[in-house]
């Protein structure tokens, strides 16, 4: 399949790299130092599941150089959503699917308003990953999960084709029939973790290991969970308790927001 990583940050680079290693034609939208490193040295992934070096990758700052693709992995930060969606237009063909792998609960609607609902698939990504430098992606968690599906639960042949391709590339991809529930579950988890990370300056393993911060973290999730229930989102009643025991709470897991907070404090 022809696939574009919009853009070549940690999430786009990881999934794009795994798909390219499996033989798919992947384009990486990048800029500045990251772009130059990708062009010169290729993409390097350092992962607990095995390192990967792709010495030759197609990286460009201009989606017009890519043209229509089968799948766009849309993984920019939320504040860049509208700008990135506009830039994505040259990569949209009649059967293109754009999978939104962003945090939050409204990226699907925002991207759909620009590219059209027929092209956009809501998704979530569970992965602890950062750029370790230009052209270098660091994956530090045992998990690297992609979840996606039509918001109304309907089948999509192009998405099904991508799911099979991702599975063949050893990507843990999990199709969902209720993506509204899935994106809210991710939001409840991540917004709470980001808040407690930034307040305490502690990774989640340390938060869970101290009774007061553990209780505070749980309370944050319960408040977000209550909002989801008021909105009619079908999150399971015991979801917060299950999340507190989840293996996704690896000892050094922290939100990207916490990394930003730390960098600002160091300046």
Residue map of PLM features:
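Internal alpha-helical scaffold of NAD(P)-dependent oxidoreductase catalytic cores
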Residues: 90-91, 114-121, 132-241
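Generic preference for hydrophobic
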Residues: 28, 59-60, 148, 259
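Single conserved hydrophobic/aromatic residue that forms the stacking wall/gate
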Residues: 248-267
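Rossmann-like NAD(P)(H) cofactor-binding subdomain of soluble oxidoreductases
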Residues: 52-137
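NAD(P)+-binding Rossmann beta1-loop-alpha1 motif at the extreme N-terminus of oxidoreductases
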Residues: 1-47, 51
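A structural signal for isolated positions on well-ordered beta-strands in alpha/beta enzyme cores
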Residues: 4, 27, 97-99, 121, ...
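Short, well-ordered alpha-helices that flank and scaffold nucleotide-derived cofactor binding pockets
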Residues: 17, 21, 86-90, 113, ...
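Basic, nucleic-acid-binding surfaces and adjacent catalytic neighborhoods in DNA/RNA-processing proteins
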Residues: 239-247, 251
């Amino acid at each position: 399949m022809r696939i574009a990583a919009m853009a070549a940050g940690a999430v786009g680079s990881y999934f794009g790299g795994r798909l390219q290693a499996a033989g798919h034609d992947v384009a990486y939208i990048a800029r500045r130092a990251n772009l130059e490193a990708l062009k010169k040295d290729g993409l390097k992934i350092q992962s607990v599941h095995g390192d990967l070096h792709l010495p030759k990758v197609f990286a460009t700052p201009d989606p017009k150089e890519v043209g229509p693709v089968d799948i766009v992995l849309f993984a920019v930060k939320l504040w860049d959503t509208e700008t990135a969606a506009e830039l994505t237009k040259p990569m949209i063909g009649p059967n293109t699917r754009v999978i939104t792998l962003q945090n939050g609960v409204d990226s699907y609607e925002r991207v759909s308003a620009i590219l059209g609902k027929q092209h956009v698939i809501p998704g979530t990504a569970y992965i602890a990953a950062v750029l370790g430098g230009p052209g270098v992606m660091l994956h530090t968690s045992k998990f690297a999960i992609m979840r996606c599906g039509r918001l109304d639960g309907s089948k999509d042949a192009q998405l099904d084709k991508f799911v099979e391709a991702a599975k063949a590339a050893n990507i843990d991809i999990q199709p969902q029939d209720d993506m509204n529930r899935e994106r809210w579950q991710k939001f409840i988890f991540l917004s709470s973790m980001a808040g407690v990370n930034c307040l305490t300056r502690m990774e989640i393993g340390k938060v869970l290991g101290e009774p007061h911060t553990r209780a505070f973290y749980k309370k944050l999730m319960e408040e977000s969970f209550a909002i989801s229930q008021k909105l009619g989102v079908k999150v399971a009643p015991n979801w917060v308790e299950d999340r507190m025991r989840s293996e996704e709470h690896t000892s050094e897991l922290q939100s990207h927001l916490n990394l930003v907070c730390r960098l600002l404090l160091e300046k």
